[in-house]
Design a protein with these regions (language model features):
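Active-site bordering "gate/hinge" segments
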Residues: 14-188
Length: 188
């Protein structure tokens, strides 16, 4: 009798899904994330923190692909799975993070912690890409450094403005004043 384990079935499904995608685009996007954004190089250490897929936010395919891509490039990568962001992580979790060159979050937990000073001594990257399909998108494959140039240009426009207006035909109408004391904040 021929039997497959759950892991073998899952790997087969994962491999088939990845094979259907344009591998070149996916690899380009992974390079963008790991090499251009996170600035990782061979022999660096990487912790990938992913949220449980059953919570409905992130698919495991993206963290699995990034793990594989990193390892193929000589980056010492490992994976840690967390629950929902409402569940507080213990101090051991944060101590573990600091043992790596970089941590990439495929978890809402990373977004909640990005402005906190919990004693992080490692580089942190928060990814809002939720699956491999999104990673291989035009946005995911657009050169990271070009995105930084666009962001910096927008920052300069905001810094040199007195008033910011945001509106759309669906009803959004926000107006805010920029003062000198808050125009130099670089948190995002």
């Amino acid at each position: 009798m021929w039997r497959l384990s759950y892991l073998e079935i899952w790997q087969s499904i994962f491999i088939q899904k990845i094979a259907r995608m344009n591998d070149t685009r996916l690899s380009k996007a992974a390079h963008n994330l790991l090499i251009e954004c996170a600035r990782l190089k061979q022999s660096d250490t990487l912790l990938i923190v992913r949220e449980k897929e059953s919570l409905g936010w992130y698919k495991n395919d993206i963290s699995d692909f990034i793990l594989k891509y990193a390892q193929e490039r000589g980056i010492h990568a490992s994976l840690d799975e967390v629950g929902s962001p409402e569940i507080n992580q213990d101090q051991n979790f944060y101590e573990k993070i600091n043992k790596y060159s970089c941590v990439i979050f495929f978890a809402r937990l990373g977004d909640q912690n990005r402005f906190e000073k919990k004693g992080f001594s490692t580089k942190r990257v928060m990814s809002y890409v939720r699956d491999c399909e999104s990673l291989a998108s035009i946005f995911g494959t657009l050169d990271y450094n070009l995105n930084v140039l666009v962001k910096n240009a927008i920052d300069r426009l905001i810094e040199n403005s007195n008033v910011i207006k945001i509106n759309c035909p669906l009803g959004t109408n926000l107006i805010g004043e920029i003062t000198q004391d808050n125009s130099k904040t670089k948190e995002v």
